[in-house]
């Protein structure tokens, strides 16, 4: 299981920004937040946390890395659900800022 912390979700006007810190197995792993293939029809957003391993040899050292997702929406997003390995790992209420 991947550890994560410091999750925030804010929407300023139309820009949704979700960010966190993810602990990965080595410095060659890059965490990404991408829209899930399955979205509900409400004002929620489902994001998949994907871990991409770079080619090469990397020391097996647990490493904290930032992850950020930004996207313009034409509507207010109220909730963000973050999914990793098919399980919801975080549910965030979006802080709307104007």
Regions found by a protein language model. Give the residues of each.
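Exposed, flexible binding/inhibitory loops of compact, secreted disulfide-stabilized domains
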Residues: 1-98
């Amino acid at each position: 299981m991947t550890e994560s912390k410091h999750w925030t979700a804010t929407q300023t006007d139309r820009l949704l920004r979700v960010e966190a810190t993810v602990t990965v197995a080595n410095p060659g792993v890059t965490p990404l937040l991408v829209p899930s293939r399955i979205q509900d029809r409400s004002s929620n957003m489902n994001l998949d946390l994907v871990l991409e391993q770079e080619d090469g040899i990397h020391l097996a050292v647990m490493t904290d890395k930032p992850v950020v997702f930004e996207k313009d929406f034409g509507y207010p997003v109220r909730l963000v659900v973050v999914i990793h390995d098919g399980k919801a790992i975080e549910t965030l209420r979006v802080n709307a800022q104007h």
